[in-house]
Amino acid sequence: MQLTPQEKDKLLVFTAALLAERRKNRGIKLNYPEAVAYITAGILEGAREGRTVAELMSFGTTLLSRADVMDGIPEMIPEVQVEATFPDGTKLVTVHHPIT
């Protein structure tokens, strides 16, 4: 299987997000890379489903709460930026203060 660097990055994010989702479902608080991967994967999947940039900017703030992550993690992630592929091309989605 031949994958581009971007495809490899997306698979790595998906794998980390899957692990984060499993831990979150078991009540384990997420660390920094898990939280970023979880939010990033949610945005990538939303773009694939056809949501707009504005919808995803709002959606990104609903994925995790302070209760889902370790202490100090919300302050470490002031924003998440994701290059997502939409039906009309690639766009940058920025989610400010993703963990509330």
UniProtKB/Swiss-Prot annotation:
Coiled-coil stretches: none
Molecular-function GO term, any one: urease activity
Top-level taxon of the source organism: Bacteria
Keywords on record: Cytoplasm, Hydrolase
Its EC number(s): 3.5.1.5
Main location, first listed in the record: cytoplasm
Any one Gene Ontology cellular component term annotated for this protein: cytoplasm
Residues in the signal sequence: none
Gene3D superfamilies (UniProt xref): Urease, gamma-like subunit
Localization annotation: Cytoplasm
Any Gene Ontology biological process: urea catabolic process
Subunit composition and interactions: Heterotrimer of UreA (gamma), UreB (beta) and UreC (alpha) subunits. Three heterotrimers associate to form the active enzyme.
Family: Belongs to the urease gamma subunit family.
Name this protein carries in UniProt: Urease subunit gamma
